[in-house]
């Protein structure tokens, strides 16, 4: 794995990147449209978490010492680290100096965080990158109740951009600002572009965040 990522890490280093986003793809079902989210992979024993954490620590330490990059772990629906409890476990078994957290507001909500801001504050010291994704609460509820796959939810509109859904981004950015967060805020929302035109929605998300940032300043 270290050898395979060498060229990409060198590109990030050349461009003075500070973090590298890490999304766990082993066993993930996020790309399987016929597989319900309930069938996602899980670590069932503490020893499995410990072993996974040790591998991430080793990889993260290598990235930092070799390229000056911080590993930003992306919790994600349909993967091993999905729920708030999974995030708690991940943070407990990884070294803060080697593994940071990519906090994704939409995946946090969809993963079961009724209050994403509380989860954000809980792990603020580990946050090194942020994806600002909103959710349509009614669609998320239907996805859970009807056993949808991740991709089915995306196509039916579980996610949208900041300012178009249920998440309080004023509270999210206030928490980040209060903690002195200096990293990226990435507007992101997996949607069907035939239904939600990319430019229009990206512009709406940017305008929402920009307005909040200007008020905070």
Residue ranges and their predicted role:
Residues 79, 108-109:
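Catalytic P-loop NTPase motifs of RecA-like helicase/translocase cores
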Residues 16, 57, 61, 84-99, ...:
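Histidine-acidic metal/acid-base catalytic patches
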Residues 1-103:
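Active-site acidic/histidine proton-transfer and metal-coordination neighborhood
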């Amino acid at each position: 794995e270290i050898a395979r990522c060498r060229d990409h890490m060198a590109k990030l280093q050349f461009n003075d990147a500070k973090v590298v986003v890490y999304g766990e793809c082993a066993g993930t079902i996020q790309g399987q449209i016929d597989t319900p989210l309930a069938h996602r992979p899980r670590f069932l024993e503490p020893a499995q978490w410990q072993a996974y954490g040790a591998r991430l620590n080793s990889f993260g330490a290598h990235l930092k010492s070799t390229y000056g990059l911080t590993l930003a772990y992306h919790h994600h629906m349909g993967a091993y680290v999905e729920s708030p409890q999974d995030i708690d476990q991940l943070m407990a078994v990884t070294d803060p100096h080697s593994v940071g957290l990519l906090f994704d507001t939409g995946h946090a909500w969809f993963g079961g965080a009724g209050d994403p801001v509380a989860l954000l504050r809980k792990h603020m010291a580990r946050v090194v990158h942020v994806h600002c994704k909103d959710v349509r609460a009614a669609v998320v509820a239907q996805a859970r109740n009807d056993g949808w796959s991740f991709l089915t939810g995306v196509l039916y509109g579980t996610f949208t951009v900041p300012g178009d859904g249920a998440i309080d981004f004023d509270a999210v950015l206030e928490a980040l600002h209060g903690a002195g967060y200096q990293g990226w805020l990435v507007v992101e929302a997996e949607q069907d572009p035939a239904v939600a035109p990319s430019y229009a929605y990206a512009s709406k998300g940017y305008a929402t965040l920009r307005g909040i940032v200007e008020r905070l300043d």
